Amino acid sequence: RPNWEERSRLCGRDLIRAFIYLCGGTRWTRLPNFGNYPIMEEKMGFAKKCCAIGCSTEDFRMVC
């Protein structure tokens, strides 16, 4: 289990689990249109950043 006070490098399954743990639950909603590319690109950039340099709890809160 990563220490959420510091940056942790999370890739693949670990990133997905952390995202669900921190952002999941009743707050989740479906995107009404998958053509909303700016949001999708932002999420992909977040995933690449977490894998390359790591991310903190605060980083997750900005994309939840």
Curated annotation (Swiss-Prot):
**Which key words tag this protein in UniProt?**
Disulfide bond, Hormone, Secreted
Domain of life (superkingdom):
Eukaryota
* Cystines in this chain: 11-51, 23-64, 50-55
Q: Which InterPro entries match?
A: Insulin-like, Insulin-like_sf, Insulin_CS, Insulin_family
Transmembrane segments in this chain: where?
Answer: none
Which subcellular locations apply to this protein? Answer: Secreted
* One Gene Ontology term, aspect cellular component: extracellular region
Q: Name one GO molecular function term.
A: hormone activity
Main subcellular location of this protein, as a coarse class: secreted
**Subunit and partners:** Heterodimer of a B chain and an A chain linked by two disulfide bonds.
* Family (UniProt): Belongs to the insulin family.
Protein name according to UniProt: Relaxin
Source organism: Leucoraja erinaceus
Q: What is the lineage of its organism?
A: Eukaryota, Metazoa, Chordata, Craniata, Vertebrata
